[in-house]
Amino acid sequence: MRRSTGGRDSEEVRLESYNAAKHAGAVREAILRALVAGVSGRDQRRLYPESPMTSKSSVSRLWVKEGAKKIGEFRGREISGEFFFGLMLDGIWLSEDLTAVVAIGMTSDGRKIVLDFQVGSSENRDVCDDLLDRLVRRGFKPVARLFSVLDGSDTLKGSVLAHYPDAVTQRCLIHKEKKIRGCLSKRHYGELFDYFKRLRNAQGAETGREIYKELREFLASKNLKALASLEEAGEDIIALHLIDAPATLNVSLLSTNFIENSFRNVRAKMGRVKRWRSETDQAERWLAYGLLEAERGFRRMKGWKDIPKLVKKLKKPDEPAQRKAA
């Protein structure tokens, strides 16, 4: 509003109520960020001793309200206009009876977008199906055959193929190497590492199959349990090689590494939670906030300029270009 200065001139005056509201909004945001960063209520009261919003009950109410907004923001984002070629799925363990499956979409221009998550008692088929059903309803549609990177769960693979029957499913090499290593004597770790290093650097179907065959023979001579672990995955560990995709994309697409990095950031923010209440939206609030924060730090995929070559490999021989990025 404007206030007369006694003459012809007047000056702009900020209402005290406006300043108070603006200050309150800043304090709310600061409290929210401090909460998810692990700052205790006591320390927050030291930062804002005059604010009534730093009482334990006020902080709790604020988190319930603002956290619910984050869930809405997370699941309300428009994704139908994006040009997705891939989907990465992995589970994050919260407690003995609470797990979340997280989906990250990969676009034709190399961006990574946290799409959604589903919380359940375990990484079971219903949880995975609910997640993918919601993505379909929201408009998730790959530009060609879907390329999916999975942590190794048969449940995840089954759900992906139920929704996208012609999807290419790549098994995470890091997870599989770790499981095979657990079956071997330590003296064989070095050789195992070398085989997987060769896979991570390999280009094309012929080289991929050759290394897979050598790895299989190596494990057959060392430990039958390790061999069984490899055969459980089968050629899913060389799915990217089998479609002759550019090796420049190996770092990004042969493991669930960048989703695991997201989980580390989320766990860091959720570390102060001592008890998860499955009867509330507590887990959803923390996941929505943590994943959105993690997404802020995402960079383009390594080798992203070669993604169009991959998409071309993913198209069926008789399939015309369905959607073209501008």
Regions found by a protein language model. Name each.
Residues 1-21, 26, 30, 50-149, ...:
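RNase H-like nuclease fold core
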Residues 27-28, 192, 208-211:
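N-terminal alpha-helical segment
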Residues 33-37:
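Short alpha-helical segment immediately N-terminal to, or the first helix within
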Residues 38-42:
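Transmembrane alpha-helical segments of multi-pass membrane transport proteins and ion-pumping complexes
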Residues 43-51:
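DNA-recognition alpha helix
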Residues 46, 59-61, 154-156, 170, ...:
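Short alpha-helical patches at protein termini and domain edges
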Residues 117-119, 145-155, 159-196:
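Conserved beta-strand -> loop -> alpha-helix junction used to position metal-binding or nucleic-acid-contacting
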Residues 201-326:
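Acidic/histidine-rich catalytic cores and adjacent linkers
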